[in-house]
């Protein structure tokens, strides 16, 4: 065989090896996005939806409810809530936990034990200062001077004397200055900043409130209205400049395996949910991109009647949102 034939064969083998390696790497990357998707099933969605409906019910029941189709008002009896035995037990346990609380100041002994002195709270001690001797008239208050004069049995000091009142005013001014200095010298609590996440993925889940599934046509329309484009790996991506040529800020994948959207059957499929994910570091500002992804998730939740969950499959409330923002 001549040299040209050998080179052609070697090139073909190398090309096939590159293609196989690329397909294998692509499948491995996809599996990272959806490891947690297997945890979702129909049963868990149904139970979570019932829990969400119970949480969403108002505490106060209106006096009249309406029949679903007839709009006929039905009077509802007003009942007074009676605490159950479980609530009384919880109250006793919380009361016991309060007894175990001890209030203390740093570098000092506890000044108040709620368990041992519940009915006799100790008043906080005031700082004691060494005042001048009793010979100095200005060191005594007006009431002390009058009491001393009555005890001694002489006419005493004239409390209406202008000189005495000037001295008392100066003493009061000095005491206030001492209090101000003490307040400025109080130790301040040290705050430790949490480390920021610089690599990996940040994810949010969106599932239906009820046991039903998301309609594919409505889901696709809502995603396109928010600027998502179906692109690489058959997923929807939010680009920087709303064009496929610009970098991807974050993406949306199908919660059902293999996590893709069939481009030829988008109007006829249903899904149990979708997942938002953003890879760190992201193009531009991580915090701004994360806020944009959260707004997109909230908008889709309102349009599709869905519920947003965290990576731990908990309700994405205001506290969870602040925790997410603190990560970047």
Curated annotation (Swiss-Prot):
CC per GO annotation: cell division site; plasma membrane
Keywords, alphabetical: Cell cycle, Cell division, Cell inner membrane, Cell membrane, Membrane, Transmembrane, Transmembrane helix
Periplasmic topological domain residue ranges: 1-4
Bias type Polar residues, positions: 57-67
Major location (coarse): membrane
Topology class, membrane: Single-pass type I membrane protein
Ranges for region Disordered: 43-82
Cytoplasmic topology ranges: 26-328
Entry keyword Membrane: yes
Subcellular location: Cell inner membrane
Superkingdom of origin: Bacteria
Presence of the UniProt keyword Cell membrane in the record: yes
SMART domains in the cross-refs: ZipA_C
Transmembrane segments: 5-25
Family stated for the protein in its record: Belongs to the ZipA family.
HAMAP family: ZipA
Description of how the protein assembles with itself and partners: Interacts with FtsZ via their C-terminal domains.
Function: Essential cell division protein that stabilizes the FtsZ protofilaments by cross-linking them and that serves as a cytoplasmic membrane anchor for the Z ring. Also required for the recruitment to the septal ring of downstream cell division proteins.
NCBIfam families to which the protein is assigned, alphabetical: septum_zipA
Protein name per UniProt: Cell division protein ZipA
Lineage: Bacteria, Pseudomonadati, Pseudomonadota, Gammaproteobacteria, Pasteurellales
